[in-house]
Swiss-Prot record:
UniProt function note: Golgi membrane protein involved in vesicular trafficking.
Alphabetical GO biological process terms: vesicle-mediated transport
Ranges that cross the membrane: 4-24, 26-46, 57-77, 90-112
Protein name: Golgi apparatus membrane protein tvp15
UniProt keyword Transmembrane helix present: yes
Length: 132
């Protein structure tokens, strides 16, 4: 399998885990869990959406998603949120946490940035970013 497609598949899989975990926790009959589940669903849909098309607002406010290190820390953070639940969602959170740690480590592997999918190459989007 091509490394670029592999990273895209991981990103889509993590986004799918976010959405699935959010829907599982959405019906937990707790206001706080339902609110957190809505945020997890939105972040999951955003992660999936970044693999399809990159809107200029994502480039401006979500620039951390365009590098292995930034996306790795985001996945690790979200994985710990999911890991705080119990049962199957905790297992899914552990998988996301592992993906986040792997992405953080991949940031320091020489030449691996060349295989990053289009959605993780921040230099491809520099012309769309406004100078502040």
């Amino acid at each position: 399998m091509d490394k670029t497609k592999m990273f895209s598949a991981i990103n889509l899989g993590v986004g799918g885990i976010f959405v699935l975990s959010g829907f599982i926790k959405l019906f937990s009959f707790s206001f706080v869990n339902a609110l957190l589940a809505l945020f997890i669903i939105v972040f999951g849909l955003g992660t999936i959406g970044l693999e399809k098309e990159i809107p200029p607002i994502a480039i401006k406010y979500g620039s951390f998603m365009f590098s292995f290190l930034g996306r790795g820390f985001f996945y690790a953070f979200m994985g710990t949120l999911l890991f705080s639940y119990s049962g199957f969602t905790s297992f899914l959170g552990f998988l996301v946490l592992l993906a986040g740690i792997a992405y953080c480590g991949a940031n320091y592997v020489a030449g691996l940035q060349d295989y990053a999918p289009r959605s993780m190459r921040d230099n491809d989007w520099d012309d769309n970013v406004d100078e502040v």
